[in-house]
Amino acid sequence: MTKNISRDRHVAVLPFPFSSHAGRLLTLVRRLAAAAPNVTFSFYSTPKSIESLFSPAERVPGNVRPYAVPDGVPEGHVFSGEPVEHVNLYLTAVGEGESLRGVLKAAEAETGRRIGCVMSDAFMWFAGDLAEEMGVPWVPFMAGGANSITAHFYTDLIRETVGMHDIVGRENDIVKFIPGFSELRLGDLPTGVLFGNLESPFAIMLHKMGRALPKATAIAINSFEELDPDIIQDLKSKFKMILNVSPFSAISLPSSPPPPPTSYTDEYGCMPWLDNRKAASVAYIGFGTLATPPPVEIAALAEALEASGTPFLWSLKDNPKEFFPEGFIKRTSERQKIVPWAPQEQVLAHGSVGVFVTHCGWNSALESIAAGVPLIGRPFFGDHQLNAWLVENVWKIGVRVEGGVFTKSGTMSALELVLTHEKQKELRARVEMFKKLALKAVGPEQSSTRNLHTLLEIVAGYNL
C-alpha cells in the first residue's frame, strides 16, 4: 500500500494545546506518521505544549515537525486561577485562524511541500475554513466522545427547545428529544450549551465547532463504536464520515511495525506499591491536569478514605497536602501512597485497583473502561458532567458522588457501593463487558481497526 501514498504529502496538524488534547492528537499522528514515513506532518502548538510533547524521551518520528504558535498570554500577566483562563487567552489570540496562516505558509516554504490535508482537534473549528481555502480535506479529531459531538451539534436545537431564559434551577429537568440519548439531565450537558458563560471564547468556540463539523471530510473520534451505538448511528446520518478509532495505541497499521510495548516512567514507585495490595482493593484517585477539588473537598475525601479504611493511591499535583486533616498522612501511612504523578494507564491495568475516583474527563473514563475498573465521578467542567451521566445512568459502570461534590459521608457511601456492596458485582460485570468490546474493536478487521486504516488513507493521501 505504501507505493500508493503521495510522496510529497504534507499534513498540517492543529491541536488544542491544553489538558490532554494535544497529547492525544499527537499520539494518533505518531501512529499515522510511522505508517506513512514519506508524509510530512507539521504540528502547530504553543511553546509550552511543544516542549512537553516533543522531549527527546518521547521519540516522535522524524516526519512529525513542531512549529510554535503564540499562546496569547500578555507579558507579565497574572493568572486568576480560573481553569479556562489560559484557554480563553489563547482562543482570543488565535481568533478565526488568522494568526496561523503565516505559520502554515512558513512550513510549506521550509518543507517545499504544499499542504494537502488539515488535521485538527475538533475544537479548532476554523481549521475547516483554512482547509476549504486551500482546497484540501479537513479531518477533525474529537478527543472526547461521540456524545459530546452530539451535544454541541444539537446546541441550537437544545437552546430553541428548552429556552435560554430562566434556565437556572432547571438543572434536574430530564429531556428526551436529543437524538441518540434516550434521556438526559439538563445539568449534565457540557459547559457552554446551556450553562456557564455562553459569551466566553471557550463557549463560542464549542458552538462554532458544532456548526462547522458537517463540512469535515471525516471526523475521527477517540472512542469505539460499540460504546455508544445509538449516538453513532445518528451521527453517521448527519456527517460525511464518522471514524471511531480508539483505543488506537493497540491497532497495527499497514507498512508500520506493530505498536511497541508501552513504555512508561514510574519514578514514584506506584507499581511496586500496588504489587503488595490485595486484588481490586485499592482506590486510585486522579483528577487530570486541569481539575483540582477545592480545599474543603480534599479534606472531605481524605476523611472518607481514612474512616472507610480503604487503601488508596492518590495522584495529587501541586502538593496541596496542607489541606489534609492534621495527622492524616501518618495515620494512613500503612495503606496509602500519595504522589505528584502516576502512570495512569498502567495503574488502572493493575489487578489491585478496584475503583477509579476521577473528574470524569473523557480520556480517564475511556482508560478506566479499557482496564475494566469501575468509577466514582466528581465532575468539574467541560464534558465531565455528561461523562458522569453516561457512567452512572447509561453504561452503569460507576456512580457520581452524592450531590456532585466530595463530602465525608457521600464519599464513604460511594466507596462502599463500588468496593464492598453487593452492587459492586453488577458494576464490575458491566465494565468488564465494555472492556471486552474495546478489545474486540481493535482486532483484525474490527470497527476501530478498519476506521484507523480509512483515516490513514484519507490523511496520508492514498490514491483511492
UniProtKB/Swiss-Prot annotation:
Pfam families membership: UDPGT
Please tell me in which tissues this protein is expressed: Mostly expressed in leaves and flowers and, to a lower extent, in roots. In flowers, mainly observed in petals, toruses and scapes, and at lower levels in pistils and stamens.
Q: What UniProt keywords are attached to this protein's entry?
A: Flavonoid biosynthesis, Glycoprotein, Glycosyltransferase, Signal, Transferase
Active site residues of this protein: H21 (proton acceptor), D121 (charge relay)
- Write out the residues that bind UDP-alpha-D-glucose: A342, Q344, H359, W362, N363, S364, E367, D383
Q: Which residues are glycosylated?
A: N38
Q: What EC number(s) is this enzyme filed under?
A: 2.4.1.115, 2.4.1.294
- The regions listed as transmembrane in this protein's record are none
Name the positions where an anthocyanidin binds: S19, H21, H152, G382
Per the UniProt entry, the disulfide pairs are none
Reactions it catalyzes: cyanidin + UDP-alpha-D-galactose = cyanidin 3-O-beta-D-galactoside + UDP + H(+); cyanidin + UDP-alpha-D-glucose = cyanidin 3-O-beta-D-glucoside + UDP + H(+); delphinidin + UDP-alpha-D-glucose = delphinidin 3-O-beta-D-glucoside + UDP; malvidin + UDP-alpha-D-glucose = malvidin 3-O-beta-D-glucoside + UDP
Q: Which SUPFAM superfamilies does this UniProt record tie to the protein?
A: UDP-Glycosyltransferase/glycogen phosphorylase
Q: In its keyword annotation, does this UniProt entry include Signal? A: yes
Record note on pH: Optimum pH is 8.
**Activity versus temperature?**
Optimum temperature is 30 degrees Celsius.
The pathway that the record names for this protein is: Pigment biosynthesis; anthocyanin biosynthesis
Task: Decide whether keyword Glycosyltransferase is in the record.
Answer: yes
Q: Which GO terms describe its molecular function?
A: anthocyanidin 3-O-glucosyltransferase activity; quercetin 3-O-glucosyltransferase activity; quercetin 7-O-glucosyltransferase activity
**UniProt xrefs under PANTHER family:** GLUCOSYL/GLUCURONOSYL TRANSFERASES, UDP-GLYCOSYLTRANSFERASE 74E1-RELATED
- Family to which the UniProt record says this protein belongs: Belongs to the UDP-glycosyltransferase family.
Q: What does this protein do?
A: Flavonoid 3-O-glycosyltransferase involved in the biosynthesis of anthocyanins conferring flower red/pink colors, mainly anthocyanidin 3-O-glycosides. Catalyzes the addition of UDP-sugar to the 3-OH of anthocyanidin, with a preference for UDP-galactose (UDP-Gal) as sugar donor and cyanidin as substrate; able to use delphinidin, pelargonidin, peonidin, malvidin and petunidin as substrates in the presence of UDP-Gal. Can also use UDP-glucose (UDP-Glu) as sugar donor with delphinidin, cyanidin and malvidin as substrates, but not active on pelargonidin, peonidin and petunidin.
Complex and partners: Monomer.
UniProt name for this protein: Anthocyanidin 3-O-galactosyltransferase 3GT1
Q: Which organism is it from?
A: Rhododendron delavayi
Gene symbol of the encoding locus = 3GT1
